Amino acid sequence: MIKKRVFSGIQPTGNIHLGNYLGAVKNWVDSQDEFDNIFCIVNSHAITIKQDPALLRAKTYELAAVLLACGIDMKKSKLFIQSEVDEHAALAWILDCNIPMGDMSRMTQFKDKSQKNPKNINIGLFNYPALMAADILLYQTDFVPVGEDQKQHLELTRDVAERFNRDYGETFKIPEPMIPKMGARIMGLDDPTKKMSKSEGKPNHGIALLDTPDEILKKFKKATTDSENLVRFNPEQIGIFNLLTIYQIFTGYSQEVIEAEFEGKGYGIFKVAVAEAVIEGLKPIQERYAKLTKEQGYLEEVLSHGASEVRKIAQKTYKEVKERVGLI
């Protein structure tokens, strides 16, 4: 039986955090037996914001090690670096030439990012969705795991594919969104109205996967909650609901069991319990990561093999696209 293909990308910037892990990476790991997974470290996307070259290279390998430590299995999945496969940029240019300006101008993420970085607005940032579309369409992808903030970009990708197929003949699969039921949107510990983000610089905003036990405990103790002091799954209690979501994913307990466990107990006790569950859950990941960082040659070999595997698919698609549009 042929497995459905899933494409997922993650930028090698900032520190990979609990939101990335619970909202994306854990689902990637859990789905490896079910799907034909392609995981891409999207370093070309990263340079839409000016990066320190040496740090970007280091972060790229660090992210690869973290993903492998989280359980990405190269016997079941493909992991590679975006810039190692030239067809991503080449297809993005062809798509650029087939996307109306109006469609790109409506992308809300460009507006948000350009407001945050008004001195660094570049064409790459504006064209970001075209490269994302190329990433996805290059591999004839069936499903793309997306959070709410990326749904608009996937809708553009679908529109681009449908328009291209209509104008040039059937070429691309039309990808479907895959939105996880739990953990899709882990919020910031300091401000639970905002999604946990790698680009947020505040020290108590998120839990990095490589944080020490002491750092994790301190951050959870300082997490924003409310004055009700009731540990219950009430979405209106946004701070405590966020912590409950994290706790439930790490423990696997039902809502009823968790609420009964902490009935009559204060937020302080609950916060420590969440921290302990996270520390215990991240321990094997951190141990595997420590081993992998000592094996740079192995990391490079794994990533090179991954690029070699996906390049075969990418070249086949790009060759067909070139022929469709009349390029030699």
From Swiss-Prot:
GO terms for cellular component: cytosol. A motif ('KMSKS' region) lies at residues 195-199. L-tryptophan binds at D135. Signal peptide: none annotated. It is an enzyme of class 6 (ligase). Belongs to the class-I aminoacyl-tRNA synthetase family. This is Tryptophan--tRNA ligase. The gene is trpS.
